[in-house]
Amino acid sequence: MTDIIIQGIYGRMGRALVEKIGAREDCRIVAGVDREAGRIGEIPVYAGFDALPCKGVIIDFSSPAGAVAAAQYGAANGLPCVICSTGLSREDEAALEAASTRTPIFRSANMSVGVNVLIELARQATKILGGEFDIEIIEKHHRNKLDAPSGTALMIADAINTEANGKYEYVYDRTQVRQKRGAQELGISSIRGGGIVGEHDVLFCGPDEVLTLSHSAGSRGVFADGAVQAALYIAALAPGYYTMTDLLRGKLICE
């Protein structure tokens, strides 16, 4: 039985995790961490890690600052962490990598298996089409999402750009530029509205045809499932920095 601590337990993803884990027999929630102390059913919730009396794998769905705090607490106390928050800066990501030298850190801005397959397909399409086709990414999310573009859109863009040896320049806004599209532009567009859980389209646009790779999340349960799988995966691993690619490919990065 794997014990799990959820940071951001009051949020949408926190509630989805409570529902998913409650139906499982291989793990359990021993505590939550959020802005205010309280309870969710039988689960105690603490207002910060300093008050936490128990141990377990930390799953973080909170904020950039919360993600760093979780990783640093995990590193100081030997607790594995699954970091799912988006909007992290380069400095935040560096802090996660530093923490991974002392405890297992699993990092993904999108815990969906399908999205990560989409990323692999985008890599392959870039290898075949990238020299002749323009590439655009369109992401859609609910009206309450704070960051734009989404962390997933940036994951896709980074995967494409790595495959293309870093030749692309990300373009988020064309309203101030009156000129033709540059050959090395990679456009990223964000849509916010209603209750859209998450949709990502990658367009490879040629002169006479368009290839579209698309993923749509039907509910937040898909992200909760992935986060739980990640928590079970890293629970007994050595310190290191792990990603969804490691989980999907079954690779263990242990030194």
Model-derived features: where do they sit?
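Rossmann-like NAD(P)-binding element
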Residues: 51-69, 75, 79-84
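Rossmann-fold NAD(P)-binding glycine/threonine-rich loop
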Residues: 71-72, 76, 85-106, 116, ...
